[in-house]
Amino acid sequence: VQVYSAVVDATLRPKFRQRGYGSVVLLAGQTVPLCGAPKPQEIPCIRPDEMGRLRATSASSLQLFADGLVGTARTAITESFAARNSRSLTLPSLVRSDVLLLEPVRLAEESQRLSSPGASGLGGFSAPGYSRDGQAVVYAFYLCGNMCGYACFVLLDRGESGWRVQSTHLLWVS
């Protein structure tokens, strides 16, 4: 969780703040702003009354699995991969006033709506890869619209006070 906190602080939160978004929802590896931010009709968002339908989980439980493939042709592949490779992890609570952790659920129609062409303010990051010498790497991306965004590897060091971002390595920018 400390790795995710450091990555969110260094990569995603500044971009959402720069664009004037309010709270942020982390959903199945995808970051989506809560509705109520400025100009909500221009960005995909999750309304507070939708939170129950998305089955918010306790802050200490998070299901990690492969996600992100879209389109009906890929649905079966994604579900098959997730069924073979999913695993449950119990994580300490990520206490943030502006971040909510939601249990990844099957959101084919929601994902389609949230990642519609021209949408802005979507981001996400991979599960961290750890080294034995106290480092971690995370793949992070931020999409600010059609043909707008970037992706990078985030290298973190484990110090006495926790994980800190050491550097980011840009992979692509649009």
State where each predicted segment sits.
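Flexible low-complexity loop/turn motifs enriched in small/helix-breaking residues
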Residues: 1-150, 171-174
